[in-house]
Amino acid sequence: MIRRAVVTGSFYPGTPERLRTQAADLIIGDLPKVRAIGAVVPHAGYIYSGRIAGAVYARLIFPDVFVMLGPNHTGVGAGVAIITEGKWETPLGQVPIDTELAKAILRNSQTIEEDDLGHQREHSIEVQLPLLQACGRPFSFVPICLFSSEFAACQDVGLAVARAIAESQRSVLMVASSDMSHYVSREQAKVKDRLAIEAILACDPERLHRVVRWEGITMCGFHPTTALLIAAKELGATSAELVSYATSADV
């Protein structure tokens, strides 16, 4: 199966030349690299969040495989949907799904379902791929889309991903795709976002999940991020750093 791009021309340029130029401009090449277990990046249109995502990717030592955890904005498909075979297409070419790792994740989970419907119209993972393609290194990936936001579902996903990565003994990096506060003032966004960011920097998935709900933080990918933190802790993560932060008002 080949999944065709659905937000090309809106979230990012629709022609290979323009997309390659913009994506390369967003990836700052001279930053010191780190070998990370996971990263959290935004997924708005490149004009709004591309520089934040690009700054994060520029800091990372490139792995062989990315596990992409994104929210399901459409509500269509399984509560937690994975695709284990095929390729995803962008104007810069096709990116293969890592079938071996995807099937290992599915095998280790009680919650994740094989389902392409949840991914068909969803942009949160798609927008990451051109930025990674612009880095010029071959890679494969595993797409996991979460609509279920209960902590138990996040825990199941996180532990399944961690077990599969540990079993693979390969170079794998997890990415949680999430924007921060929506539909509030810049001042309100910064206050609320800080609460979520502090939980992420503390590598505390329970705290993140709790504070987002209690404080009414409209962080659309808090559940993929919670799952990532659970997996990262299981894989030995003990610290995190903030690479960059901005709101759409800063553009």
Segments and roles (model prediction):
Residues 1-230, 234-237, 245-250:
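Active-site histidine-anchored catalytic micro-motif
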